[in-house]
Regions:
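Surface-exposed, beta-sheet-biased, low-hydrophobicity segments with strongly acidic/polar composition
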Residues: 1-193
Length: 193
């Protein structure tokens, strides 16, 4: 699957390997940034100039992870990033990790007005898992270039992530690329399970 816009989620069923792309149906808001803005975020002062109400869920009946460009969430699960780089060394879930649940956050949804004056950005209010969020990072000094996050103990290898789900099952994941099979950067598609 490829993401042509920022308004889609790719749902992954880790049991079957099936992926399904669905339009985001969460509540949305557009922010117009200017010095006279009444609210403030990391980009500056803004006013909310448009909203869209949340619609009924369109997620598949069975899914484990969902990706929105580089954002990742679980299906009511918890995640964490380890400093381990060898996926084969993890045989069961460790007990000494800090599990992180999904949280509601404003995720970038519409960037068509980013280069206009005044700047207008669209956001969706959806879930993200901060324990899994750092599987990649923005490369400093670039405009929108991302790279895999590497382990602190071995900067040449990606860390292993752990995810436990509400049914008691779990996944041990190591992201190995930001590119899909065609070499295009846009989604998570190369996962070692």
């Amino acid at each position: 699957k490829t993401l042509e816009d920022y308004d889609k989620w790719v749902y992954v069923n880790l049991e079957t390997g099936e992926t399904v792309m669905k339009e985001d149906v969460s509540g949305q808001e557009w922010r117009t940034y200017s010095e006279d803005g009444k609210q403030k975020d990391q980009f500056g002062k803004y006013n909310i100039t448009k909203t869209v109400e949340e619609r009924p869920s369109n997620a598949p009946a069975k899914w484990h992870l969902a990706f929105h460009i580089y954002d990742v969430r679980t299906n009511n699960g918890e995640g964490c990033m380890t400093d381990t780089t060898d996926i084969e060394t993890i045989k069961s879930l460790p007990t000494n990790v800090k599990w992180v649940s999904d949280i509601k956050a404003y995720l970038i949804y519409d960037m068509k007005g980013m280069m206009k004056k005044p700047v207008v950005m669209g956001y969706m209010k959806n879930y993200v898992n901060m324990g899994l969020y750092y599987w990649m990072h923005k490369v400093k000094g670039t405009m929108g270039e991302y790279a895999l996050t590497m382990s602190k103990s071995n900067p040449k290898k990606a860390p292993v992530f752990l995810v436990r789900f509400k049914d008691g099952s779990y996944a041990i994941i190591q992201f190995t690329s930001l590119k899909d099979a065609t070499g295009r950067k846009k989604e998570a598609s190369t996962i070692s399970l």
